[in-house]
């Protein structure tokens, strides 16, 4: 907005302040929950931040690779663990429903509080 290039600005902030952001949720994918690209999966950890690709509610945008899926994050008051589950809305990749292979438990740097 102010004509100052900001590429990598937020990455530099996260590197200088590890854990300042615990979870970064993104909702854009064109692939299945088992896919990786450049050695990276749908859930990655860097700079003390978990980056999660949490959903793709499209089926026909890129029909060969895109499938509708979403994630459920479960927090428990007083716990630093977050359960991440993957739900497949169709059976084009695996049976429709919860997809245990993509389930993860994340460990935050501090407990969750309501």
Residue ranges and their predicted role:
Residues 22-23, 50:
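Proline-centered loop/turn at the N-terminus of a beta-strand
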């Amino acid at each position: 907005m102010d004509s100052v290039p900001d590429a990598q600005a937020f990455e530099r902030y996260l590197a200088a302040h590890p854990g300042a952001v615990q979870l970064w949720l993104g909702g854009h994918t064109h692939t299945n929950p088992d896919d990786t690209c450049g050695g990276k999966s749908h859930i990655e950890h860097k700079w003390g931040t978990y980056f999660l690709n949490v959903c793709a509610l499209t089926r026909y945008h890129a029909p060969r690779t895109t499938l509708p899926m979403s994630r459920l994050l479960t927090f428990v008051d007083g716990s630093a663990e977050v359960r991440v589950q993957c739900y497949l809305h169709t059976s084009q990749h695996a049976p429709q429903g919860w997809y245990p292979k993509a389930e993860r438990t994340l460990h935050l740097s501090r407990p969750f509080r309501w």
